[in-house]
Amino acid sequence: MFQRTESIDDIGLSRILQTDKSNTISSLTKVICTIGVKSRTVEELSKLLEAGMSVARFDFSWGSHEYHTETLMNLRQAMKNTKILCATMLDTCGSEVAVRLAAEDVSSFDKDAPKTPLVMKEGNKVVLSVCNHEEDQKNMVVTSEFFPVVNCDSLCEIVSVGDSIFIGQYLFTGSETSSVYLTVDSIDIENKQVVCTCNNDALMRGVLLTVQISNIGEKLPTLSRNDEHDIVNWGVKNNVDFISLSFTNSAEDVRKCRRILDEHKSFHTKICAKIERASALKNIDEIIEEADGVIISRGNLGTELPPEKVFILQKMILSRCNVAGKHAIVARLVDTMAEAPRPTRAEATDVANGVLDGADALLLGAETLRGNFASETVAMVRKICREAERFYDHESFYNAQISQRKIEAGEVSQAEALASSAVRAGTKVGAKLIVV
């Protein structure tokens, strides 16, 4: 890991307090936005583009192909109106386990959400029941004691007595009042039910809940049949730029996704491996080598790891991606801006430190999916990124990267030598852009 900031003594207080007047200049660190109900109109997408969105993320954990296609058409119109280009990312559902609180299509989160939240009480029994058939889902009744799991037929086989289960609102923001921890008491294989004890009080809101099961490891596939269908019939069809491969566990998961893309001549589409489970960490080096980029999903990863371990794993993964020359993306940043116009001081510092750690892009989830301040969030994150970049020691970082590459791979390749020469020349003349 390398020193990436200038010496504090060399910066000077006057420079720190200097007002940044370059509001029209975009940050070098890119901003990825998850598009949802509140941000999918042409008007809102135009605001996101003008605020600094670089990549639009289409999350296939919910919504039909027709729904996402309509959103994509709106994005293209917004790009035409603003004359600002934007890449597209398809995020697979992967092995995510879900609970629906309403039978309707979850494309319209607010409209279909139950009017009153489910009240969870510590010590109460909760039954998780497999409910995979469409007819059963239409007739299901959800209560604080009964949760239907809609997309995991093998639930009873992958859990064990004593396992911890976390349930939170889709793209949960970490609030202890809107998520619940359960402990598995017994498993009824015949009736496909798991009986649990609730460990905390909570108010469960929204239409879609996600379920995180401890020790699940590689028991569920990274790419389901639905994921393959989404990639081929929507991603390839619409020429997406990136695939976000949810719950990547190994390099083979990436290779499988690449084979699907290659079979359909989608050679340009890049694959970003999403690190969401602790089990993926033992394969992190081979995943980085195989993927085009890595997304550190701190939300899901944080439910499986002690909080004090997340920061050092972030620094380690970002550093290894930088040395390997792979895209490094950090998720879960300014959760409070889903409901507030400003981030907390801790969140603002977290964003800046992500930039200084070497993140190439920052991924916004609930803030732009269902948040009330989507474009304001993008503008704020971009401002923090730009401020952090003012004090980023690019030259020292560059020299450290070259040295590290020589240590790990011997002499640099011809392509790397050409690229490094271009960077040196650009730095010396103060170039704003390098055109390849």
Question: Which ranges hold each PLM region?
Answer:
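Non-catalytic helical/linker scaffolds that mediate oligomerization, partner binding
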Residues: 1-436
